[in-house]
From Swiss-Prot:
Residues in the signal sequence: none
Protein name (Swiss-Prot/TrEMBL): Large ribosomal subunit protein bL33
Annotated region described as Disordered, given as residue ranges: 19-40
Family statement drawn from the similarity comment of this UniProt entry: Belongs to the bacterial ribosomal protein bL33 family.
Biological processes annotated in GO: translation
SUPFAM superfamilies reported in the protein's UniProt record: Zn-binding ribosomal proteins (SSF57829)
One GO cellular component, as annotated: ribonucleoprotein complex
Keywords in alphabetical order: Ribonucleoprotein, Ribosomal protein
Length: 65
Protein backbone atom coordinates (compact mmCIF):
# COMPACT_ATOMS: atom_id res chain seq x y z
CA UNK A 1 0.00 0.00 0.00
CA UNK A 2 1.32 3.43 -0.97
CA UNK A 3 2.18 6.06 1.63
CA UNK A 4 0.45 9.42 1.83
CA UNK A 5 2.23 12.12 -0.14
CA UNK A 6 4.13 14.87 1.63
CA UNK A 7 2.53 17.60 -0.49
CA UNK A 8 -0.90 18.85 0.57
CA UNK A 9 -3.27 21.44 -0.92
CA UNK A 10 -3.81 24.47 1.35
CA UNK A 11 -6.04 27.54 1.09
CA UNK A 12 -4.65 31.04 1.68
CA UNK A 13 -7.02 33.82 2.80
CA UNK A 14 -6.44 37.58 2.89
CA UNK A 15 -5.95 38.90 6.43
CA UNK A 16 -7.00 42.50 5.70
CA UNK A 17 -10.26 41.84 3.81
CA UNK A 18 -12.24 41.03 6.95
CA UNK A 19 -11.24 44.19 8.84
CA UNK A 20 -11.81 46.77 6.06
CA UNK A 21 -15.39 48.14 5.76
CA UNK A 22 -17.24 47.24 2.55
CA UNK A 23 -17.39 50.90 1.45
CA UNK A 24 -13.59 50.91 0.98
CA UNK A 25 -13.52 47.61 -0.97
CA UNK A 26 -13.68 47.24 -4.70
CA UNK A 27 -16.09 44.29 -4.38
CA UNK A 28 -17.71 42.29 -1.59
CA UNK A 29 -16.05 39.11 -0.38
CA UNK A 30 -12.72 37.68 0.73
CA UNK A 31 -9.73 36.89 -1.47
CA UNK A 32 -8.61 33.24 -1.41
CA UNK A 33 -5.85 31.36 -3.21
CA UNK A 34 -5.06 27.64 -3.29
CA UNK A 35 -1.51 26.31 -3.36
CA UNK A 36 0.54 23.29 -2.31
CA UNK A 37 3.03 22.99 0.51
CA UNK A 38 5.43 20.30 1.63
CA UNK A 39 4.30 19.01 5.02
CA UNK A 40 7.83 17.95 6.04
CA UNK A 41 9.64 21.21 5.21
CA UNK A 42 7.03 23.72 6.41
CA UNK A 43 5.14 22.40 9.41
CA UNK A 44 3.85 25.81 10.53
CA UNK A 45 1.13 27.77 8.74
CA UNK A 46 2.05 29.35 5.43
CA UNK A 47 2.09 33.16 4.97
CA UNK A 48 2.58 34.71 1.54
CA UNK A 49 2.22 38.21 0.17
CA UNK A 50 -0.29 38.04 -2.69
CA UNK A 51 -2.51 40.46 -4.63
CA UNK A 52 -5.97 40.97 -3.11
CA UNK A 53 -8.45 41.95 -5.86
CA UNK A 54 -11.01 43.07 -3.25
CA UNK A 55 -8.68 45.76 -1.85
CA UNK A 56 -6.72 46.24 -5.10
CA UNK A 57 -3.31 45.93 -3.38
CA UNK A 58 -0.73 43.42 -2.13
CA UNK A 59 -1.62 41.93 1.28
CA UNK A 60 -0.56 39.04 3.51
CA UNK A 61 -2.49 35.83 2.90
CA UNK A 62 -2.43 33.17 5.65
CA UNK A 63 -3.19 29.49 5.52
CA UNK A 64 -6.63 28.50 6.82
CA UNK A 65 -7.90 25.08 7.85
Amino acid sequence: MAKKGTRIVVTLECTESRTVPSSKKRSAGVSRYTTEKNRRNTTERLELKKFCPELNKMTIHREIK
